[in-house]
């Protein structure tokens, strides 16, 4: 019995000793893991600050590139927009790509890029014809390309269509047709919409820069107002957006956007349309400003004059009324382009469209609202602001494209007789020489 008791004591001592060893090991391991946890927390604390620094640096770098292009002239802005187009197209196409399948379908990637080049050729050709056709009328090589631009573009597209059908491979039909549809949707939303932004640019830098500026302004102030006052969520697809930020961004965009526009409208380099891509901020532009930039006197209704003790008339440029509409669309409608992009990212379970801009994600993440806003400004400008007039270039365009050689000679003779009858005798020798050369 004594031996059994001593054995039990020894066993209990061993068990207690083992427990002590385990406790010592646990305490030792806890001591070793504490520094690791602290290091991890420090690294997590540093990460947001590093991301903020990277984001800030790239923000100023992008602003520098953008304003440099603006100063260098319209051609460089068009080039910048083209680079953005290609970058966004690449990011969106990459979402639906499946590398393992594309290895078996080597033509898929080529066809995607071929359709992009064909669409760019058509879009830029349309813009060049609309705004710079007078530069190509006298060029015997370029004139046929301008005259038959749409037919050439269509035939280039047909070549791509035939290549796609010829590349169809058994077992991959569904994937290939989904790629075909995805490519055309991307071309419509990216190249199609940015085409109108370039047309805005040719109507005057004002109509390009102001919408871009409004979207950026709304993005910044919607974020700040949401951080300070945000309580009610706005839309499910983008949970961080709030009603307070949405409305606060709109109010701030209307006010600050009007101040920015007030400064820009005093520079003809911004408000004048361009018909020469070699212009820059240093060469300047000269034109008769659009009437929306000129002050108009408006009569205030008597009800408001009596109620609020306002003056009977007010002098104001009509552009401010249009800018209020631009700011409203940029703040309340254009963000839905961003919500559309957010929904697309959630559908494909990705955080960003790419990593081309460190700290910001991809180009698509920054341009999702700009494209939709650019289309609206173009449609609004052409409907309510653009001044329709016939220029010398338009008349020459009609004479070259619509009249036969005999009719063109008759036009010159009639124009000569008209000018001579009005005392412009100096043109007689010039016209006579031209007619002799033509005959």
UniProtKB/Swiss-Prot annotation:
Keyword set, alphabetical order: Endoplasmic reticulum, Lipid biosynthesis, Lipid metabolism, Magnesium, Membrane, Nucleotidyltransferase, Phospholipid biosynthesis, Phospholipid metabolism, Phosphoprotein, Transferase, Transmembrane, Transmembrane helix
Membrane topology per record: Multi-pass membrane protein
Domain of life, source organism: Eukaryota
Subcellular location: Endoplasmic reticulum membrane
Protein name per the record: Putative phosphatidate cytidylyltransferase
GO biological process, one term: CDP-diacylglycerol biosynthetic process
Family stated for the protein in its record: Belongs to the CDS family.
Pathway membership, UniProt: Phospholipid metabolism; CDP-diacylglycerol biosynthesis; CDP-diacylglycerol from sn-glycerol 3-phosphate: step 3/3
Enzyme Commission identifier(s): 2.7.7.41
TM helices/strands, residue ranges: 52-71, 76-98, 110-130, 145-165, 180-199, 245-265, 321-341
Provenance organism: Schizosaccharomyces pombe (strain 972 / ATCC 24843) (Fission yeast)
Residue list for modification Phosphoserine: 12
Chain intervals with Polar residues compositional bias: 24-33
Coiled-coil regions listed: none
Catalysed reaction equations from the record: a 1,2-diacyl-sn-glycero-3-phosphate + CTP + H(+) = a CDP-1,2-diacyl-sn-glycerol + diphosphate
Reported cofactor(s): Mg(2+)
Region span, Disordered: 1-37
GO cellular component: endoplasmic reticulum; endoplasmic reticulum membrane
InterPro entries: PC_trans, PC_Trfase_euk
Known function: Supplies CDP-diacylglycerol, which may play an important role as both a precursor to phosphoinositide biosynthesis in the plasma membrane and as a negative effector of phosphatidylinositol 4-kinase activity, thereby exerting an effect on cell proliferation via a lipid-dependent signal transduction cascade.
GO MF, any single term: phosphatidate cytidylyltransferase activity
